[in-house]
Amino acid sequence: MNIYSIIKKPHVTEKTSLGTEAANTITLVVDRDSNKIEIKKAVESLFKVNVTSVRTVNVAGKVKRFGRNYGKRQNWKKAYITLKEGQTVDFFEV
């Protein structure tokens, strides 16, 4: 798999921003078919950092209503990536 198809986007919420500061962890939305080894290699090669651990969560899509019809949002995978001490990734760097 291509590293750009494995890593889709950063997942930025209030909870993940607290984890970034406290535990040196970044959170990414990744491809559902990717595994921890592929995610680790993609992050290390793309951001030039050392990855200590990768934890993944499969998130089920919510059922939403569109007028009278019901639909379902897509399932997705989230990865919590712990970086080596002293290393950071700044997603909003200009």
From Swiss-Prot:
Q: Keywords on this record?
A: Ribonucleoprotein, Ribosomal protein, RNA-binding, rRNA-binding
One cellular component GO annotation, for this chain's record?
ribosome
What GO terms in the biological process aspect are recorded for it? Answer: translation
Give the InterPro entries listed for this entry: Nucleotide-bd_a/b_plait_sf, Ribosomal_uL23-like, Ribosomal_uL23/eL15/eS24_sf, Ribosomal_uL23_CS
Q: Which GO terms describe its molecular function?
A: rRNA binding; structural constituent of ribosome
Pfam families per UniProt: Ribosomal_L23
Provide the family line. Belongs to the universal ribosomal protein uL23 family.
Q: How does it assemble?
A: Part of the 50S ribosomal subunit. Contacts protein L29, and trigger factor when it is bound to the ribosome.
The record's function comment reads: One of the early assembly proteins it binds 23S rRNA. One of the proteins that surrounds the polypeptide exit tunnel on the outside of the ribosome. Forms the main docking site for trigger factor binding to the ribosome.
What this protein is called in its record is Large ribosomal subunit protein uL23
List the source organism: Trichlorobacter lovleyi (strain ATCC BAA-1151 / DSM 17278 / SZ) (Geobacter lovleyi)
Instruction: Give the gene symbol.
Output: rplW
